[in-house]
Amino acid sequence: MTQDEMKKAAGWAALKYVEKGSIVGVGTGSTVNHFIDALGTIKDEIKGAVSSSIASTAKLEALGIRVYDCNDVSELDIYVDGADEINPERDMIKGGGAALTREKIVAAIAKKFVCIVDGTKAVDVLGNFPLPVEVIPMARSYVARELVKLGGDPVYREGVITDNGNVILDVYNMKITHPKDLESKINGIAGVVTVGLFAHRGADVVITGTPQGAKIEE
């Protein structure tokens, strides 16, 4: 089974958590694209979706799924999204696709976060994947200096502007043993919009695509 086939297995398995008549929170990325395809097969059974990115919105609308503004929805039953890394405590690094802030907002209004990944994303300690930080452009240099003080090596992600008009710093060489503490510290730096650590709001369900199919941990 290829990596993409494992992603597909995880994405389609998440359909079991979609309630009839509900509005579904939808993340961003290659694994989520498989979930969106799956969602398209039951589009007449759901009310619609709240999307975490312009890219996911376009894909949802192309399949005829109504996309609601996050401001018009007070609560979601589920939010389905991938991760760049996930540890045994279900803390995650997200933001490889630069949609981390909107992902964090949609996750915040969801009762249940269903994380869909392939087996390569599971780690014991977060930090091998560079940690994305969304930053207001004028604060980029200042935030980078502060991230160095926290032990990281920040690199400006050239040519990338987020859906919110901001820039991304990818922080390398961080062994993240206390994800909640680090999330709070980085979010406290002036000019940071958010960090791609999802520890205060981790996953509730993890669906992992494996060569044997989807493995579900609740």
Swiss-Prot record:
Keywords: Isomerase. One of its GO terms (cellular component) is cytosol. InterPro entries: NagB/RpiA_transferase-like, Ribose5P_isomerase_typA_subgr, Ribose5P_isomerase_type_A. Pathway: Carbohydrate degradation; pentose phosphate pathway; D-ribose 5-phosphate from D-ribulose 5-phosphate (non-oxidative stage): step 1/1. The keyword Metal-binding does not apply. GO terms for molecular function: ribose-5-phosphate isomerase activity. Its EC number is 5.3.1.6. Substrate binds at residues 28-31, 81-84, 94-97, 121. GO terms for biological process: D-ribose metabolic process; pentose-phosphate shunt, non-oxidative branch. It comes from the Bacteria. CDD domains: RPI_A. Gene3D superfamilies: 3.30.70.260, 3.40.50.1360. It catalyses: aldehydo-D-ribose 5-phosphate = D-ribulose 5-phosphate. The keyword Repeat does not apply. The active site is at 103 (proton acceptor). Belongs to the ribose 5-phosphate isomerase family. Homodimer. Catalyzes the reversible conversion of ribose-5-phosphate to ribulose 5-phosphate. This is Ribose-5-phosphate isomerase A. It comes from Vibrio cholerae serotype O1 (strain ATCC 39315 / El Tor Inaba N16961).
